[in-house]
Amino acid sequence: MKNTFLNTVKGSLIISCQALPNEPLHSSFIMSRMALAAKGAGAAGIRANSVVDIQAIQDEVDLPLIGLSKVDYPASPVYITPTIKEMRAVAATGCAVVACDVTGQPRPNGEKLAEIVATMRTEFPDTLLMADTDTIENVKVADKLGFDIIGTTMHGYTPATTGANIADNDFAYLKEVLQATSRPVIAEGKVDTPEKMKRCLDLGCHAVVVGGAITRPLEIAQRFISAL
């Protein structure tokens, strides 16, 4: 079966529907309803965390999914689909894309990213792989490893990029990413206004993922409260 994800989301908004255990909306049911709202608004796809959330969302909407699994391992800073175990579990849901950390940091159990990619290509040949990158160097690593999609997800969230924002200097970093790879780039991370989303698309991004600015009411409310 041909994966039609890239055609479906081109030039569009993907909404990330995630809530971690310490957040008020942590519930697979709530995430499924959030996805329904996203679909109603016109989102072209959903990004979701954990097998149970992915399955609940699949039961609710027919939008294509970017799936991932956030797991904390004690001896590794990598937490987005960090090992082959999580990669397999997410891919087994049938989601169109599996996203994982590509930040060059050591993975749990000494696993190697190149081996994970090779295994996924053999076991799930129809599943697209998205690299959640943080730096130009790691964009190039992901490109060389053959990831289908390059994401800017981790820019600003790793020790090497602390404090960075995708919108800095008129999106200078994003422009570099687009120059560094010919693969589809999905902008993600701190894209918190419609204007920033549009700018990412105008610069040449294939699609844009927006999460917290839409689906995390605690964070949204805090922005208003902090202005008082």
PLM feature segments, named:
Residues 205:
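C-terminal binding/interaction regions
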Residues 48, 129-131, 185-189:
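Conserved hydrophobic beta-strand within the GNAT/NAT acetyltransferase core sheet
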Residues 1-92, 123, 129, 137-149:
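Conserved N-terminal beta1-alpha1 strand-loop-helix module at the mouth
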Residues 186-191, 209-213:
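Glycine-rich beta-strand-to-loop/alpha-helix junction loops that act as flexible
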Residues 24-28, 47-66, 77-85, 102-120, ...:
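Active-site-adjacent beta->alpha loops and helix N-cap segments on the catalytic face
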